[in-house]
Amino acid sequence: IVKATPLQDRMRQERRLANQFKSPFKGLPKEVSVLTAISFLVAVGFGLIIPAIPIFAKTFGVSNTLIGLIISSFAIMRFVSGLFSGKLVDRFGERVVLGFGLFMVSIFTLLAGLAQSYEQLLIFRTAGGLGSSMFSVSAGALILRVVADNQRGRAQSLYNGGFIAGGVAGPAFGGALIALSPRAPFFIYSALLIAAGTVSMIYLHESRLGARVESQQEYFLLVGLGFVLYVCQMEQILWFDQC
């Protein structure tokens, strides 16, 4: 009997440990891990600007009511444009709409950070909600399309987990950036969205996608409503903390 060397024993132990701690993405299409990474980047950036919005809006000398409108305009536009975004996905495909939506939010977030008046900030924040709707609807459609029925729950939980993790990390860094300038979080968020959009265009390929599922516009409408409630709850908490 040949006795194993210490190196061989260590390699066997490493293999056993690797088998015990399997990746949660194991067995899922590559698109799921890519979408999870994208959702994390988006959520980090979104969390960056949440504490900055009320402070930035105050610099224009407007009332609390108008500041509240800035806070809610993004979520409202995201909600009302859900069905329109679903039609875009049906016509142009998930990857195109997802990438275009991310770049659209990036541009309008940058413009919001450069806003010189309350009206400009309101318009740019509202327009960004349309791009955000395009991203979320196309990402949801892509998961439905590439993941088998018996794996969709796990895929959706990983995707949502990426967003939640980013949402937890973002506000902490956003608070630090405000000390530099209330505009700074907008610029960082815009850069993160460009990175996320680039990742989507590189790693999500239409040629690998399966047949499309039937239109899920009602589902996307409910997702949009859930996002509105989530955003309003988070931003109201932060807004009242600023009062």
Model-derived segments and their meaning:
Residues 4, 201-213:
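Helix-loop junctions on the cytosolic side of multi-pass membrane transporters
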Residues 75-83, 167-168:
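Residue-level signature of mid-helix packing/kink "hotspots" within the transmembrane helices
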Residues 57-58, 88-89, 173-179:
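Interfacial helix-cap and linker-helix signal at transmembrane-aqueous boundaries
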Residues 159-201:
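Helix-loop-helix hairpin linking two adjacent transmembrane segments in secondary transporters
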Residues 108, 119-127:
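Paired small-residue
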Residues 124-163:
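Cytoplasmic helix-loop-helix junction between adjacent transmembrane helices
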Residues 80-116:
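Conserved MFS/SLC helix-loop-helix module at the cytosolic interface between two early adjacent transmembrane helices
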Residues 50, 228-243:
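Extracytoplasmic gate region of multi-pass secondary transporters
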